[in-house]
């Protein structure tokens, strides 16, 4: 099968949507404040965006609550109508995919080809998956003791607060919206302040798709103001968040201090990628390289700790360094480039500081380790060896193109070392031995384990983490259940039914 043709990006794309979206209208912030969103390839301003804060969150939550009232238009819709709206939104994303991916590459910095073939397609898929689920939410009849008819209802949890990260802005906005709407909820979405533009473009498509006013509201703003207001709001029934573990902990605290709102968290990772000597070495080197370098290393489940058996360690390192040196970095609109910039200057500085800490603590820098150029936020693909588990680079989430390669001797040792982390989002094992593969997969403390592959996702399957990598699951029916409350009803009957 030939590779899909990638269209040209939109030249000189005008940033059209920069306002807050409440009740199907674009409005200015209550305060009148704006914030700049920056092109990470150049460091230059793309646009000024309306800066929502507590007052704007209050307005958005009120709109979502009004849309959720029992007598509201939205609540009178059939479940299949909610599915139809999600299908329509997916179709509109497909129709606008070139504009959306151009905008995402400008605002986020990821290569245009990756945006077009990956993120936009994922957004469409997740919307269509949950669109099909909307009219298939069913309860049970229960053979309870006594003269009663007993059944369950699965009801929408209510008003949802969704907070999305900057690494997959459009895809993860759609991933929050889809199950919430399928379940019958309304929501307020706050996109990451680094990358608000595709979420606001999506807002225009929400209105075009025909969603009733107030069902989906999108408020750009800063995390410590708009984000905090959303997580602490007493009229929000559930928070769904993807981002850092530190912010996830604040969300849990906010839930406990307010109304015990339901919480789903998909947080950080330090995922082990284990290579056994019987694996296909060329394949394992390439997949391990992509597992940490793709999206500039800005992936929560990136294979950031590569464990290689001692029998193939030296050759694996040699080939991995050779591959990293060949990885092309530069303008994300140039199809020859595999990596664009990191998302912003803060992230750039964090990555470079952690690289320096690795060198200081005794890790061997095999290649890379420096900023590329002085314009934009580009980092060289970097490989470290001689890393120990006590080093900061081995413990902290770098979220950049930095591969750490460890040596191991046997299965039990590598399982113990792989699990020696506070995270547990994902893991991988490469081997031709099914017994080894299953032993390792079943022993790893991770929500997802890949065998002889990496970063393979299906919306039919749940995704989420053990330990400090999160709480709850997204995708599949597990992800839908997170937006539902289960009610048990007993009806007294004259006789046993």
From Swiss-Prot:
Positions marked as site (Transition state stabilizer): 167
Active site residues per record: 266 (proton acceptor), 300 (nucleophile)
Enzyme class: oxidoreductase
The keyword Transcription is assigned to this record: no
Its EC number(s): 1.2.1.3
Catalyses which reaction(s): an aldehyde + NAD(+) + H2O = a carboxylate + NADH + 2 H(+)
Keywords: NAD, Oxidoreductase
Gene3D superfamilies from the UniProt entry: Aldehyde Dehydrogenase, Chain A, domain 1, Aldehyde Dehydrogenase, Chain A, domain 2
Binding site for NAD(+): 243-248
PANTHER family: ALDEHYDE DEHYDROGENASE-RELATED (PTHR11699)
Protein name, per record: Aldehyde dehydrogenase
Species per Swiss-Prot/TrEMBL record: Enchytraeus buchholzi
Gene of this entry: ALDH
């Amino acid at each position: 099968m030939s590779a899909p043709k990638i269209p040209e990006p939109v030249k000189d794309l005008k940033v059209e949507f920069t306002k807050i979206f409440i009740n199907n209208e674009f409005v200015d912030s209550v305060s009148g404040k704006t914030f700049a969103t920056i092109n990470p390839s150049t460091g230059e301003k793309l646009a000024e965006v309306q800066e929502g804060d507590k007052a704007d969150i209050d307005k958005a939550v009120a709109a979502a609550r009004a849309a959720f009232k029992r007598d509201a238009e939205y609540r009178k819709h059939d479940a299949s109508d909610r599915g139809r709206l999600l299908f329509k939104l997916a179709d509109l994303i497909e129709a606008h995919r070139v504009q959306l991916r151009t905008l995402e590459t400008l605002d986020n910095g990821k290569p245009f080809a990756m945006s077009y073939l990956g993120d936009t397609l994922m957004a469409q898929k997740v919307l269509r998956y949950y669109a099909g689920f909307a009219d298939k939410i069913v309860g049970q009849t229960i053979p309870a003791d006594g003269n009663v008819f007993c059944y369950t209802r699965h009801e929408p949890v209510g008003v949802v607060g969704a907070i999305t990260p900057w690494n997959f802005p459009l895809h993860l906005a759609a991933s929050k919206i889809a199950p919430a709407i399928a379940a019958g909820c309304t929501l307020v979405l706050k996109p990451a302040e680094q990358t608000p533009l595709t979420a606001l473009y999506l807002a225009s498509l929400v209105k075009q798709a025909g969603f009733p006013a107030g069902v989906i509201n999108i408020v750009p703003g800063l995390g410590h103001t708009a984000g905090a207001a959303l997580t602490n709001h007493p009229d929000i029934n559930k928070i769904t968040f993807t981002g850092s573990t530190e912010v996830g902990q604040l969300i849990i605290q906010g839930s406990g201090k307010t109304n015990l709102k339901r919480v789903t968290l998909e947080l950080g990772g330090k995922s082990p990628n284990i290579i056994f000597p019987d694996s296909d070495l060329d394949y394992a080197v390439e997949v391990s390289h992509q597992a940490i370098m793709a999206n500039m290393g800005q992936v929560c489940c990136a294979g950031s700790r590569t464990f290689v058996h001692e029998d193939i360690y030296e050759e694996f390192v040699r080939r991995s360094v050779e591959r990293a040196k060949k990885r092309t970095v530069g303008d994300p609109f140039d199809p020859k480039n595999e990596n664009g910039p990191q998302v912003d200057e803060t992230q750039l500085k964090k990555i470079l500081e952690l690289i320096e800490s690795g060198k200081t603590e005794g890790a061997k820098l095999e290649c890379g380790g420096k900023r590329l150029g002085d314009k934009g936020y580009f980092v060289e693909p970097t490989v470290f060896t001689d890393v120990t588990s006590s080093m900061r680079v081995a413990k902290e989430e770098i979220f950049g193109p930095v591969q750490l390669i460890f040596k191991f001797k046997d299965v039990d040792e590598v399982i113990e070392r792989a699990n020696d982390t506070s995270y547990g989002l994902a893991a991988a094992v490469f081997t031709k031995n099914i017994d080894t593969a299953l032993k390792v997969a079943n022993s790893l403390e991770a929500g997802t384990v890949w065998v002889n592959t990496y970063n393979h996702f299906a919306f039919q399957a749940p995704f989420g983490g053990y330990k400090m990598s999160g709480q709850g699951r997204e995708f599949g029916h597990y992800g839908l259940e997170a937006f539902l409350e289960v009610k048990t009803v007993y009806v007294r009957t004259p006789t046993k039914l």
